[in-house]
Amino acid sequence: MKKNLWITAMLAVGSVVLAKAQYSSKPPEVSPAPMKPEMTEIWEPEVKVVTPAKVLGDAPSDAIILFNGKNLDQWVSQKDATKPAPWKIVNNDHMEVVPGSGGIQTKMKFGDCQLHIEFSAPDVVESEGQGRGNSGVFFQNRYELQILDSYNNRTYRNGQAASIYKDHAPLVNAMRSPLEWNSYDVVYTAPRFKADGSLDYPARITVFHNGVLVQNNVTINGLTLYIGLHHYPEAHGEDVISLQDHGNKTQFRNIWLRKL
């Protein structure tokens, strides 16, 4: 018994020593020779040059343009991916959900990405709660960033605009008033799976709503469900981004993405 206690104590001390070694405030010993500045300079490979947009919110030079207001060439019907996206283009400026037609999804598949998307509630403000300007952005066709008219419109906190639906409420409500355009700027990290199909580590997401941080690198706890608890039922790779038809004439414009 005493021997077991002694071993346990030594293991605990060893763990503390190891932790201190890993996170020491002292610089590592690299050489008996004095350090020079150039010894810690990394020159190759050079960092890729990307030209930023002249207008904040517009696409940088390496972005994939998913929607520019002119056509839906990058999208297909979610009901039948062999058919064109059934939503309508308005004034060569934005697209509008056609209620009952079903969601739409990208032709391309994505994993880790930076996404910019702008949206507006329907022109006519009606209904309340989840019935007002409802839609959603689904990453890898599974994990929903909620779209809702949350301006003076109370609903459950993990279901309002900029929530990771029924998973994480936003840090604040940064919704603009009706008829104004809103923007999401998102950094999404896809989940990773082991060779046997089990989860290695979950998806994570950071969201800025109209320039305001509302999701700070939060863990996505699994598949978005209306009823039930979040989980990761199966392994998957890159997949489409989809926009939800929730029966409201929600509008979208200026959608672009950068693969990360």
Where do the protein language model's features map onto the residues?
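Carbohydrate-interacting regions of secretory-pathway proteins
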Residues: 20-260
